Swiss-Prot record:
Active site: 176
Catalytic activity: octanoyl-[ACP] + L-lysyl-[protein] = N(6)-octanoyl-L-lysyl-[protein] + holo-[ACP] + H(+)
Entry EC number(s): 2.3.1.181
Protein name: Octanoyltransferase
GO cellular component, one term: cytoplasm
UniProt pathway: Protein modification; protein lipoylation via endogenous pathway; protein N(6)-(lipoyl)lysine from octanoyl-[acyl-carrier-protein]: step 1/2
Compartment(s) where it occurs, according to its Swiss-Prot or TrEMBL record: Cytoplasm
Molecular function as annotated in GO: lipoyl(octanoyl) transferase activity
Residues of the BPL/LPL catalytic domain: 35-214
Length: 223
C-alpha cells in the first residue's frame, strides 16, 4: 500500500460551475472531519470567473462586470479561474497528517514546483509572496496561485496552475494583490502541455507532498 492509497483522486472533465463545486467541496470536508468520507484531491477547470479571498481589497477588482465574482472563504486576495488553468482542491485531514498550516502551504508550493520541473520549467517560491514564480528581473512572473482554508483541521480549496489560460483575463483584477508582477503560463513559456500530462505529474509527485506535511516545527494556530 502506498501513502496515498486511501485518498480519492478525482478529475472532472469540462468546466465546473464555481458555486456548486464549492458547496460540494465544503460538504466533503465536513464528511472527512466526521470520518464519513475519504480525503480527496479534486482536479478540474472552472469557467471564467474571479474569486475574492479573505484578504481581498475592493480596489483590487478592476473590472467588476467582466466575469462573475465570488466571495471565497480561502485565504489570499483576488484571483482568476478559467479554461486552461488546472485547479486542484486539496481536502486532507491535517489532524492526522500534521497540524501545521504553514507547512501545508509550503508542501503545496513544492508539489507544484516539482510538477513544473517535469516540463523543464524552473518554478520557485518567494519569501513573503505565496504562490509559484518563474523567471527573474523583468521576466519574473507568477505561474501558480495558492489559497487554502482549514476548518477543524481539514483543508479545502487549494492551488491553481496556469497551463494555457487566456492571460488577458487576469487584467480585470490585481492578482493576489501584487500588481507589480506579471502572470504567465506554461504555454507562454513555450511548453504546450496537455492537461492530462500535468495531472500525471501531479500524481507522480504527490507522495513527496504528503511526506512534506511533517515539518520539524508545528503550528499552534487555531482552525
Amino acid at each position: 500500500m502506498t501513502v496515498d492509497d486511501d485518498i480519492e483522486w478525482r478529475v472532472t472533465p469540462g468546466l465546473s460551475p464555481y458555486a456548486e463545486t464549492v458547496a460540494e467541496m465544503e460538504a466533503r470536508a465536513a464528511a472527512i472531519r466526521a470520518g464519513e468520507a475519504r480525503e480527496l484531491i479534486w482536479l478540474l477547470e472552472h469557467p471564467p470567473l474571479y474569486t475574492a479571498g479573505t484578504s481581498a481589497e475592493a480596489d483590487e477588482l478592476l473590472l467588476p462586470d467582466r466575469f462573475p465574482v465570488f466571495r471565497s472563504g480561502r485565504g489570499g486576495r483576488y484571483t482568476y479561474h478559467g479554461p486552461g488553468q488546472r485547479v486542484g482542491y486539496v481536502l486532507l485531514d491535517l489532524d492526522r497528517r500534521g497540524r501545521d498550516v504553514r507547512c501545508f502551504v509550503a508542501a503545496i508550493e513544492n508539489w507544484v514546483i516539482a510538477t513544473l520541473g517535469d516540463f523543464g520549467i524552473a518554478g520557485r517560491s518567494e519569501p513573503g509572496r505565496v504562490g509559484i514564480w518563474t523567471g527573474h528581473g523583468p521576466d519574473e512572473a507568477k505561474i501558480g496561485a495558492i489559497g487554502v482554508r482549514v476548518r477543524r483541521w481539514v483543508s479545502f480549496h487549494g492551488f491553481s496552475l496556469n497551463v494555457d489560460p487566456d492571460l488577458s483575463h487576469f487584467s480585470g483584477i490585481v492578482p493576489c494583490g501584487l500588481g507589480e508582477f506579471a502572470v504567465t503560463s506554461m504555454a507562454r513559456l513555450g511548453i504546450p502541455a496537455e492537461m492530462a500530462a500535468v495531472d500525471a505529474a501531479l500524481r507522480r509527485h504527490f507522495p513527496a507532498m504528503l511526506a512534506g506535511l511533517r515539518c520539524s516545527t508545528r503550528s499552534d494556530k487555531d482552525s
